[in-house]
């Protein structure tokens, strides 16, 4: 992927290539998963009344878990599938960030001069902290949209982990190169627009 980044750089400056990279990866990899995840989430919400009724009816937790498992299978809405998107995004995030960090090391001269607006040097942290701040707000807004009320311990763990990761990545954005902050922020904004649009269209 590093060679591809350097190759594409022959046709556009880094300040455009980095956002384009984020949009391309989001559109080709995470968008299809997001669509499937949203459909699963809606089926999950629809089956909640049946699960609550089963919880009242079942005498033991073992019976309840058995019935709940059958309902998830029947409606094809296992809670884990709702979080297929963040589970997929984690390795993609790590891989893309690593490749971009390598690009900063390999191409320091062009990275230091091909920024834009207030961040002209992509090898340094955002001088005004604007991108990290936007990243934090976007992440938290996304989490509020994706959060699903549920008694499932697994979903509660994912919700908590999502909020913690949002604060961690936003904090790191204040310390790392603007190249990475630009990629993370573009990716987060794309994700937010994607989630809002899908909820209106699907």
From Swiss-Prot:
Residues 96-125, 190-202 are mitochondrial intermembrane. GO terms for molecular function: membrane insertase activity. It is found in: Mitochondrion inner membrane. It is a multi-pass membrane protein. Residues 36-74, 147-168 are mitochondrial matrix. Signal peptide: none annotated. InterPro entries: YidC/ALB3/OXA1/COX18, YidC/Oxa/ALB_C. Keywords: Membrane, Mitochondrion, Mitochondrion inner membrane, Transit peptide, Transmembrane, Transmembrane helix. Pfam families: 60KD_IMP. GO terms for cellular component: mitochondrial inner membrane; mitochondrion. The chain crosses the membrane at residues 15-35, 75-95, 126-146, 169-189. GO terms for biological process: mitochondrial cytochrome c oxidase assembly; protein insertion into mitochondrial inner membrane from matrix; protein insertion into mitochondrial membrane; respiratory chain complex IV assembly. CDD domains: 5TM_Oxa1-like. Belongs to the OXA1/ALB3/YidC family. Required for the insertion of integral membrane proteins into the mitochondrial inner membrane. Essential for the activity and assembly of cytochrome c oxidase. Plays a central role in the translocation and export of the C-terminal part of the cox2 protein into the mitochondrial intermembrane space. This is Cytochrome c oxidase assembly protein cox18, mitochondrial. It comes from Schizosaccharomyces pombe (strain 972 / ATCC 24843) (Fission yeast).
């Amino acid at each position: 992927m590093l060679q591809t980044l350097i190759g594409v750089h022959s046709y556009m400056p880094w300040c455009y290539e980095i956002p384009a990279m984020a949009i391309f990866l989001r559109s080709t990899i995470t968008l299809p998963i997001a669509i499937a995840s949203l459909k699963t989430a809606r089926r999950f919400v629809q089956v909640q009344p049946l699960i609550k009724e089963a919880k009242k009816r079942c005498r033991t937790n073992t019976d309840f878990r058995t019935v709940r498992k059958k309902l998830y299978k029947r409606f094809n809405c296992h809670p884990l599938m709702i979080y297929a998107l963040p589970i997929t995004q984690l390795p993609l995030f790590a891989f893309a960030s690593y490749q971009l960090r390598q690009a900063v090391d390999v191409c320091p001269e062009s990275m230091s001069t091909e920024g834009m607006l207030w961040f002209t040097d992509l090898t340094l942290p955002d001088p005004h902290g604007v991108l990290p701040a936007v990243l934090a707000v976007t992440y938290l807004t996304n989490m509020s949209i994706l959060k699903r009320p549920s008694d499932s311990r697994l979903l509660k763990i994912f919700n908590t982990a999502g909020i913690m990761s949002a604060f961690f990545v936003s904090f790191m954005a204040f310390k790392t190169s603007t190249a990475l902050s630009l990629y993370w922020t573009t990716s987060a904004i794309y994700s937010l627009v994607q989630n809002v649009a899908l909820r209106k269209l699907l």
